Amino acid sequence: MDVKHIKDYLSWLYYQYLLITCSYVLEPWEQSIFNTLLLTIIAMVIYSSYIFIPIHVRLAVEFFSRIFGGQHESTVALMS
């Protein structure tokens, strides 16, 4: 790919970001605060998803396996 094409594409993505978030009307210092808050919120969502989703999936699998008559843990341990 051409370097100019990549640069144009990234500037177009940044322009789309400014339009979607309406942050093009903010002062530069307001934009930096807004971007910092947005990045912090996104980081917290990703971290929380990484920590809590596997736990909830495991609990849901255990719950539904008990409802639909799955084998108990003691039975599985004896069979292996």
Curated annotation (Swiss-Prot):
Location in or out of the cell: Endoplasmic reticulum membrane
GO molecular function: serine C-palmitoyltransferase activity
Pfam families reported for this sequence: SPT_ssu-like
GO biological process terms on file: ceramide biosynthetic process; endoplasmic reticulum organization; sphingolipid biosynthetic process
Family: Belongs to the SPTSS family. SPTSSB subfamily.
Quaternary organization: Component of the serine palmitoyltransferase (SPT) complex, which is composed of SPTLC1, SPTLC2 or SPTLC3 and SPTSSA or SPTSSB. The heterodimer consisting of SPTLC1 and SPTLC2/SPTLC3 forms the catalytic core of the enzyme, while SPTSSA or SPTSSB subunits determine substrate specificity. SPT also interacts with ORMDL proteins, especially ORMDL3, which negatively regulate SPT activity in the presence of ceramides.
Annotated keywords: Endoplasmic reticulum, Lipid metabolism, Membrane, Sphingolipid metabolism, Transmembrane, Transmembrane helix
UniProt name for this protein: Serine palmitoyltransferase small subunit B
GO CC annotation, single: endoplasmic reticulum membrane
Cytoplasmic side: 1-11, 58-80
InterPro entries: Ser_palmitoyltrfase_ssu-like (IPR024512)
Ligase is among the record's keywords: no
Associated pathway: Lipid metabolism; sphingolipid metabolism
